[in-house]
């Protein structure tokens, strides 16, 4: 093999790697804000966090009702953009769905409480996770990330990046979990 053949092979390989990386980045970009279903739903982690008053909470508290767990922070601009739509979602579906906005801010309630009040969020229930235990348990790569847990307590999918949570697209994604939860809630009441 001559040096020209080796050089050509190296350039071709480098070009192939660059194109593959660009295609993967484009695919990832397209998926931001879209629902990514779990191939095999698993039970939600038993990781604890607290409510805004500092009382312990866990995902078991929501069993029997689907929950959207939104991981966010006050410094995250895309998080702030989607918060009003999460508040509207909770308002529209309060009897069928729980929305848990889990702040990953390290400053805790001193920073989060006034911030939420200033945003005018009225229905959205705020939780705190200053050590990011919830984010680690769900292998979160960035904020915002929202995890959808069904009424049986299984992680069924996620949305990485901001989403318009009260849009027709997201409502269509949530609909099967809302419909299946009504049976689970009835069974739990027996």
Where are these regions (language model features)?
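Bacterial N-terminal signal peptides that target proteins for export
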Residues: 1-11
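N-proximal helix/coil linker or "cap" segments that precede and/or mark the start of modular domains
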Residues: 21-46
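Short pre-active-site segment immediately N-terminal to redox-active cysteine/selenocysteine motifs
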Residues: 65-67, 71-75, 142
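Structural microenvironment flanking redox-active thiols in thiol-disulfide oxidoreductases
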Residues: 80-119, 130-136
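Thiol/disulfide oxidoreductase modules built on the thioredoxin-like
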Residues: 116-123, 129-176
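Non-globular targeting/processing and membrane-anchoring segments
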Residues: 181-190
